[in-house]
A protein has these predicted regions:
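A glycine-rich helix N-cap at a beta->alpha junction
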Residues: 58-86
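N-terminal beta-loop-helix "entrance" segment that forms/cooperates
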Residues: 47-61
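Histidine-anchored nucleotide/phosphate-binding helix
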Residues: 22-35, 41
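A short aromatic-anchored loop/beta-hairpin motif
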Residues: 74-75, 83, 90-92, 96-98, ...
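Anion (oxyanion) recognition and catalysis
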Residues: 33, 76, 115-116
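Polar low-complexity intrinsically disordered regions
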Residues: 5-9, 118-120
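Short, glycine-rich nucleotide/cofactor-binding loops
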Residues: 10-23
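Short internal beta-strands
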Residues: 38-44, 82-86
Length: 124
């Protein structure tokens, strides 16, 4: 197993049904990136909808945060990684080709390894 380095791992399991909660990991992950702390947001369950092209454009803004699409784009532009659960997109009939730029698919082993290697893990 690799040595733990300073990085933060966020797991998000909701989307449009809870826009404020869906925004939180992207706000925190962008702040981490601004602090030179690498961050990854892993979308699981309904969270995978956020990686579907066109979905975020139609989401209601959550809390006092900017629109979720802007939060996602800002995070990716800072070099943040977005992982999307393969079984979750299959269950929701979302094709890999329909995922936003800057996202990549992942499965259980990679998610577990990232959690073990991260300084902190937050689940939303």
């Amino acid at each position: 197993m690799e040595e733990k380095v300073e990085k933060i791992f966020y797991i998000l399991t909701c989307a449009g049904e809870n826009p404020e909660k869906a925004a939180m990991p992207f706000v925190l992950a962008s702040a981490a990136m601004a602090m030179d702390i690498p961050a990854t947001v892993c979308l699981q369950g309904n969270g995978v909808y956020l990686a579907q092209k066109g979905y975020a454009e139609h989401m209601v803004k959550g809390g006092g945060f900017p629109p979720i699409k802007k939060l996602i784009l800002d995070f990716v532009e800072q070099g943040g990684k977005i992982w999307v659960c393969v079984p979750c997109i299959k269950e929701r009939n979302i094709a890999v080709e329909d995922l936003i730029e800057g996202s990549e698919t992942t499965a259980a082993a990679k998610v577990n390894l990232e959690a073990l290697q991260s300084s902190a893990v937050f689940v939303y």
